[in-house]
Amino acid sequence: MDKLKISANGPLNGEITVSGAKNAALPLMCAGLLTSGTLRLKNVPMLADVKTTQKLLQGMGARVLTDNISEFEINGGTVNNTCAPYELVRTMRASILVLGPTLARFGEAQVSLPGGCAIGSRPVDQHLKGLEAMGAEIVIEHGYVKAKGKLKGTRVAMDVVTVGGTENLLMAATLAEGTTVLENCAIEPEVVDLAECLVKMGAKISGIGTSTMVVEGAGELHGCEHSVVPDRIEAGTFLCAVAITGGRVVLRNAAPKTMEVVLDKLVEAGAVIEAGDDWIAIDMRQRPKAVDIRTVVHPGFPTDMQAQFMALNAVAEGSCRVVETIFENRFMHVPELNRMGANITTEGNTAFVQGVEQLSGAVVKATDLRASASLVIAGLAARGETVVEQIYHLDRGYENIEKKLGSVGAKIERVSG
């Protein structure tokens, strides 16, 4: 099993190109099931979850071609199987996103209940409740969601803000008969990206980027070409890496308007940030200052950046609180950071961080995707060698992270065994 060996190597300097967002690419790929035409996606990150989604769509009969760099062609005209099996779905929660489009287009779908990151309960009840409101008959048998029926437009008020639920119901509504009003929608950039692609495919959607979207059902959708929005979490991870080591790095193919609260927190920590339409520059010349974090739904501070800022705060000047309001059980990186010399205590959904001057390298285990990133960041500033094990989590969300960090001066290598 691969692992990363990391040693501090001074400030980082240079340029990094940000990949497309995995959390946008996966629902966009599933949207290919809505049409018999060809959906051409650009700026797709070549990640494990993307490859799993490719296999899932191909298993359903879709024709999926890729240049294995950043482009995909998905043709749903050959779909001949409406079942998404456990073997593929078990590794990735986003697999549930085939449910809405498959049911809407074919009148039936069978999808195994998903797996994915071990960071607490992330139920799909809002997905199912919304589809039932639109006329679907749904039962859960032997670990599978079995749905059938012709979908009709209606008002769906989600009980909680859910990104995946919003995406699933939005895709389903594009082919439902009549008008669907989706209330309490997630407004993350990845949801907006999906909606904008669906409009290119012929969907009629108003209220994009707001908590209420109105969808006029279309008889059918067609193919289109779409570029995946840049990954704001990958960008934020690299910015935290520079903030902890010092240096100056420019991120290309970035989307600063999608991550303003993260940039504000970096400035609060002592970084100098500049940004244009598609680039971000960070200049860090001092020990970071501790910053309080409270995760909330977009446009607030993203839960997917909490662990990275925990690593930054671990060596910051002063003390702070980190409050996690989105997921329970998302402090699994704390014991590993403490093994490296951090001074972090937790109480419920709050972590109390007292910054230390330096961390010490250690053998640490990644427990989920963003926890992995926090350990990499910590290793870049620790005295001695850090070995991050179980990095298959990291590969689910970061494309060539060791090569990208290495290109700006980090001492980091992937080793097998």
UniProtKB/Swiss-Prot annotation:
The active site is at C117 (proton donor). One of its GO terms (molecular function) is UDP-N-acetylglucosamine 1-carboxyvinyltransferase activity. The keyword Cell wall biogenesis/degradation applies. Pathway: Cell wall biogenesis; peptidoglycan biosynthesis. Pfam families: EPSP_synthase. The modification 2-(S-cysteinyl)pyruvic acid O-phosphothioketal is found at C117. GO terms for cellular component: cytoplasm. SUPFAM superfamilies: EPT/RTPC-like. Gene3D superfamilies: Enolpyruvate transferase domain. CDD domains: UdpNAET. UDP-N-acetyl-alpha-D-glucosamine binds at R93, R122, P123, V124, D125, Q126, D304, I326. Its main location: cytoplasm. GO terms for biological process: cell division; cell wall organization; peptidoglycan biosynthetic process; regulation of cell shape; UDP-N-acetylgalactosamine biosynthetic process. Its EC number is 2.5.1.7. Belongs to the EPSP synthase family. MurA subfamily. Cell wall formation. Adds enolpyruvyl to UDP-N-acetylglucosamine. This is UDP-N-acetylglucosamine 1-carboxyvinyltransferase. It comes from Neisseria meningitidis serogroup C (strain 053442).
